Amino acid sequence: MFALSAILSGCNSGATKEAAPSTPSAALTMKDGKYDPPVTISYLRPWGPDVKFKSGEDQDNNVHTKWAKDTLGIDLKNQWISPSTNNAFETKLRLSLASNAEMPDIISYRGEFNLVRELIETGKFVDAGELFDKYASDTWKAAMNEDPSVWYPYMQDGKRIGIPILDYSYNGDPVMWIREDWMKKLNLKAPETLADLETIMDAFTNQDPDGNGKKDTYGLTIGFKNWLNTWMSDAGWIFGAYGTMPNQWNLNADGKLEYGSVNPGTKQALATLHDWMQKGYIPEEAGVYDETKASEEFTAGKAGIVVGPHWMPSWPLEDVKKNDPKAEYKAYPIPSGPDGKAGRHGTSNGNGVVLINKDMKNPEAFFTYQNYLFDHYANPKAGDVFENGFAEGYDWAMKDGKPTTDASATGGYAPEKYTLTFDGARIPSLSMETLAKLASGEEATTPFEKKIKSGVPQPMIDAAKIVLDQKDIAMNQMFTGAPTMTMQMNNDILSKMEKDTFSQIIYGKAPVDAFDKFVENWNASGGEQITKEVNEWYQSVSAKK
């Protein structure tokens, strides 16, 4: 994403030259861990509407840039500033590329994957993997090594062009949220299997769990206006009970990638959903509900079960108490299917990328910056500069002689959002492991653990333990590359075919056996070729070098 000048001048041939690794042009001098004289890092990143500054501060002058200058001798400068809304950042960056404008040292981005691939394919970025191996701290390397496949989206010709921005692992992996007060009232047992769950759904649908004398409740809320396998009000786990996960590429027993929506288990899951629709266990409007709208059926007191991430007590589950102050909800594990299988979609450890301009004079300066955040901010020790947060008066304050992160005391500022990588630094496993530790009744001993304990509701802590206890059932999206040639041509047709067929089967407008014809048509309409291309990509990125 950086230096484009030389690129467009040579693109009339259609060839892309591989960028040579960046080599420091001048040795930097450090005194007491700080560059002296200071070094400047120019950069680009989108600025979202969730980022707010104190009066007198802005993107180039704030508590974070002051910290970088005072502590590390690094002067951070935006090449230009653009908001992330309405694709403004993407539009301006593409215009800069087209006009051969000068690019900054660093581009840090989370958003449109096609833009990332466009930038990588310009050949203007170094093999960041080589720089990472040379300059990254042990803490950062260990965090990255928790899942090396996080590099895959940013690889080209075996080179790691972009450095993945790490996020907390399992953050979107689902658990089953059930109205616990309804469970108690109807004397129901925890569901371990789909059969157990059907008993609960039948009771929620037919035994008046809210006690209002009306038949106005049902079992499970889902929404598949977008997809069945989705981030909230999810139905992917139903397919997991039959050994697959739809709308993603899964690793099969032969070590090959397979599109989950054409796996035979999908037919069984669709038959199950059709049965539940007929019995009134799921909403008749499920096909037009998106994720948020479907979840509102739970918070409105209509549905007794919703499946989604461990953080749902923060939003939107507490809204159920607006309708019924005595309402209770509890997290349960994902149940297994008739053959003992259970599955849920997994969540990537990556959430964005950093690209380094091949013309950056001193790329090691970026690693000095990010290493410090991984070593001191990601999981600070007692007495460390970031023990209570990034900066007093911003994300933490003293109240009654104790540090607090309560927004009423701090003003609700989040200086980690000012950083080059949007969140400061995150060790993927740390958040969920901390939550699981607290759920087991262990004492919070580290600053990170104490911060989590003080700010996270107990149901969320309990749910996190379930997520970790069931980590072996997670099924990750294994294709994370750019759309293949045939995908670009045929994906719209294939997606419409899939959505239409699945919806018709669930609603009973087509027989379950229509799935077999769908698979045949999917393969003939480009799916077979896409499968070949996806596996060629997978072999290229996963091959041992």
Residue ranges, per PLM feature:
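Short, solvent-exposed loop/beta-turn-alpha elements that line the ligand-binding surface or hinge
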Residues: 33, 127-146, 189, 245-264, ...
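C-terminal motif of bacterial Sec signal peptides marking the signal peptidase cleavage site
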Residues: 6-10
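Paired acidic/hydrophobic, glycine-rich loop segments that form the ligand-binding mouth/hinge
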Residues: 104-108, 304-309
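Carboxylate/His-rich catalytic cores and anion/metal-binding grooves
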Residues: 113-152, 201-204, 213-250, 305-318
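Extracytoplasmic/periplasmic substrate-binding proteins
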Residues: 47-65, 170-177, 184-190, 224-281, ...
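Conserved small-residue motifs centered on glycine
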Residues: 368, 375-500, 509
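Helix-loop-helix "hinge/cap" segment bordering the ligand-binding cleft or interdomain interface
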Residues: 129, 155-230, 251-293, 297, ...
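Conserved N-terminal structural module of periplasmic/extracytoplasmic solute-binding proteins
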Residues: 11-196, 258-259, 468, 472-545
